[in-house]
Amino acid sequence: MIVGTVINAAGILLGGVLGLTLKRQLSPARQNAIKGLLGVLIVFFGLKATWVSLGGGAWLVLKQLTIIVLALTVGRLAGRLLRLQKTANRLGRTAGETFTRFAAASPGTKPKWNEGFLTCTILFCAAPMAVLGAAQDGLDGYWATLALKAVIDGLATMAFVTVFGWSAMAAVIPVVALQGTITIAAQYVAANTLSPAMLASAHGTAGLLVFCVAMLILDLKKIEVADYLPALAFAPLITWLWK
């Protein structure tokens, strides 16, 4: 089951419907309040995911934490070589500029359907939470991250539909395709390849990365989260090697 992705899709569609109905965005004060609440919740669920992945005696917990740190270190090196964060930044910047351009345009200026669709697709799919949440959902059914992403995407869609119309809501299709594929692939790997210890290390690593996303949302620390995404693959690999 792709529970998290279904919740995420519902959030996008609900936000779009509300945006088209109300024809206005939330006030800056309400946006900031929701942003702060989401940041706190993401901190909680991220650290909770890491905490529940740890278990056993002091030596075993130390070993598990060491594996997570090693995975993050190696993962970041791989991510930088693959230029994951730079690519995500470039895509996000392009999408943001497109939205800003049409938001500031005269009322008679209407964007093409594909411009709204592509802009929202990039913003929803290039977010680190898309990969992290979908992977967590597939590895052990932990869909809380995608539920929080559903709120974020829903609020964004409320704003996007006022500029792009219903084409912004159509971005739900690639979101479901991408996140659903990641979740199903993670489910297959978890069921056929990973041991409980390997699953725990991947889940713990994902939890810390989700915590890093909260630091970005709360404007506390600029962390290149996308560069760390390969750590999700390195964590179970290091666990397997360190028997």
What are these regions (language model features)?
Residues 191, 236-243:
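Juxtamembrane boundary at the C-terminal end of a transmembrane helix
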Residues 7-15, 19, 23, 39-40, ...:
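Alpha-helical transmembrane segments in multi-pass membrane proteins
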Residues 1-14, 63-70, 138-151, 193-207:
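Structural signature of hydrophobic alpha-helical transmembrane segments
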Residues 215-233:
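Interfacial loop-to-transmembrane junctions
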Residues 109-190:
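Helix-loop-helix junctions within the multi-pass membrane cores of secondary transporters/permeases
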Residues 23-26, 30-90:
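Membrane helix-loop-helix hairpins that form the core translocation module of multi-pass transporters
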Residues 18-32, 50-58, 159-205, 209, ...:
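Transmembrane-helix boundary and interhelical-loop signature of multi-pass inner-membrane proteins
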Residues 28-29, 83-116:
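Intrinsically disordered, low-complexity non-transmembrane regions of multi-pass membrane transporters
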